[in-house]
Each structure stands twice: as structure tokens, then as C-alpha cells.
């Protein structure tokens, strides 16, 4: 019965280390889904123990399939990232860190229809969104100020209280409207800055393309000129060689004729 409650959802038999890891993982998921005190330290210790058990499971001889180990790692990393997000100061930072968390894809136990880490992820997102909304409206996170104003308006016993509630509500609405206008101006400024940077980048890219095209054109022209000069030098070299050959032939013929004449003239002189 204990194995059915804690065992991971797969047909093969699991080792004792994996059973302990799954049981501790289920415990951590249930603790993460509950409302905890700020000084609660057990969940962080449990997650640290999960990391150690996961590392031991990876090097075990009878370790599970790689998909199962990947799912375990995904859930442990999610719990670790959730604890790190809770330590941040502002709700906007918490919400941003929560967006980058990746919950598990497969339920840890057979009783779960939806992975517990996914439920915890949705709860954290809703809580951080509520805190951000409360900070923007200048209200307490629990919404006690809004409930108190509604109660005062509903009683109707004192006109002064009604006027005070109405003025407080108007103040909240004005503040909210001012924040919205400020955000709209900032977004408009960012859009203008982005447009300016985009136009500047396009201009720089266009100039670079023109420079590159001009350089390629000049390179082609220089290559054509180099080919023409090479052909001209080759023709000139061939002409020089031809003239040299003719000169050598003439010299050889002259020497040959001179030798013949010399041989014929010398006997007559004797």
C-alpha cells in the first residue's frame, strides 16, 4: 500500500532509493501547495535532500529510464526555483522568476490527474499577480482595505463614513488611473526609442550594404584589369622571345657562312 501511494507511475519495479525519492517528492509537492510561514525551513531542507537522492539515483546501477530521471530532475529544479523566487523582495521579481519555472509533465502518483507541480505553479502565478495588483493599487495584499470600504458603504449608518469611503475609493481610482497613464507614457517612450533604434540600424545596414556592393564592384573591375594586363604581359613576353630567337638564328647563320668562306679562302692563300 505504501508503494502504491509513493511509487512513480511506471510499470517496472523501482529500487528502494527511487521509492524514497518519490515519497519525499510527494511530500515536498504537498508542502509547496500549502500556505507556509515565512520562517518555514523544512521544505528547503527536503529539496536539498531530493537533489542528493537524485544524484545518487543517476549513478546507481539499476537506475530508471532517462525519461523518468529527466522528469524527476524537472520537478526538483522547479521546487528549487520556486524557493528561490519566494526569497525575492518585490512581487514583480517573483512573478518574473515564476514565469521561467517549468513544472513537471507527468503526475507523480496514480491518484493525481494533473501534476502537482503544475498546480503549484498556477497557484504561485495567481498569488504573485494578486500581490502586484495590490501594490499598484496601493492596497494590502489580502484586500482588507477594499473589504473595509465596502462594509462602511453598506452600513449606511454615518454619512461621514460614506463620504470618507467614497473619497478613499476616488483616491484609489485616481492613483490607479495615474499609474496607468504613467505606464502608457513609458510604453510609448519605449516604442519611440525602439523605432528610432530600428531606423538607425536600418540606415547603418543600408550604408554597409552599399559599401560592400561598391567594394565588390571595384574588386571585379580590378580583376578584369589584372587579367588584361596579364594577357598583355604574356603577349609582350612572347614577342621578346620571338625576336631573340630570330636574332640567334641570324647570328648562327652569319657564323656558319663566315666559317665556310674562311675555309675556302685559306687554302688559296697558301
From Swiss-Prot:
Signal peptide: none annotated. It is a single-pass type IV membrane protein. It is found in: Endoplasmic reticulum membrane. Keywords: Coiled coil, Endoplasmic reticulum, ER-Golgi transport, Membrane, Protein transport, Transmembrane, Transmembrane helix, Transport. Its main location: endoplasmic reticulum. Residues 1-242 are cytoplasmic. The chain crosses the membrane at residues 243-263. GO terms for cellular component: COPI-coated vesicle; endoplasmic reticulum membrane; SNARE complex. Belongs to the USE1 family. Component of a SNARE complex consisting of STX18, USE1L, BNIP1/SEC20L and SEC22B. Interacts directly with STX18. SNARE that may be involved in targeting and fusion of Golgi-derived retrograde transport vesicles with the ER. This is Vesicle transport protein USE1. It comes from Mus musculus (Mouse).
Amino acid at each position: 500500500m505504501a508503494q502504491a501511494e509513493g511509487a512513480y507511475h511506471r510499470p517496472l519495479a523501482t529500487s528502494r532509493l527511487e521509492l524514497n525519492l518519490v515519497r519525499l517528492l510527494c511530500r515536498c509537492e504537498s508542502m509547496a501547495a500549502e500556505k507556509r510561514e515565512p520562517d518555514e525551513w523544512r521544505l528547503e531542507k527536503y529539496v536539498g535532500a531530493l537533489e542528493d537522492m537524485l544524484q545518487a539515483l543517476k549513478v546507481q546501477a539499476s537506475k530508471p529510464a532517462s525519461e523518468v530521471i529527466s522528469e524527476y530532475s524537472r520537478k526538483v529544479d522547479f521546487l528549487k526555483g520556486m524557493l528561490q523566487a519566494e526569497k525575492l523582495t518585490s512581487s514583480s521579481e517573483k512573478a518574473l522568476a515564476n514565469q521561467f519555472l517549468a513544472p513537471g509533465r507527468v503526475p507523480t502518483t496514480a491518484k493525481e490527474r494533473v501534476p502537482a507541480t503544475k498546480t503549484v505553479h498556477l497557484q504561485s502565478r495567481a498569488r504573485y499577480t494578486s500581490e502586484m495588483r495590490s501594490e499598484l493599487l496601493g492596497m494590502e495584499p489580502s484586500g482588507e482595505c477594499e473589504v473595509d470600504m465596502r462594509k462602511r458603504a453598506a452600513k449606511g449608518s454615518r454619512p461621514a463614513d460614506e463620504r470618507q469611503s467614497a473619497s478613499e475609493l476616488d483616491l484609489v481610482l485616481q492613483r490607479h488611473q495615474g499609474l496607468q497613464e504613467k505606464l502608457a507614457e513609458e510604453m510609448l517612450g519605449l516604442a519611440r526609442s525602439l523605432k528610432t533604434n530600428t531606423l538607425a540600424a536600418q540606415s547603418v545596414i543600408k550604408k554597409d550594404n552599399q559599401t560592400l556592393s561598391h567594394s565588390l564592384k571595384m574588386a571585379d573591375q580590378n580583376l578584369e584589369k589584372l587579367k588584361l594586363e596579364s594577357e598583355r604581359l604574356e603577349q609582350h613576353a612572347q614577342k621578346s622571345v620571338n625576336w631573340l630567337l630570330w636574332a640567334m638564328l641570324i647570328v648562327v647563320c652569319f657564323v656558319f657562312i663566315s666559317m665556310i668562306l674562311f675555309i675556302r679562302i685559306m687554302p688559296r692563300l697558301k
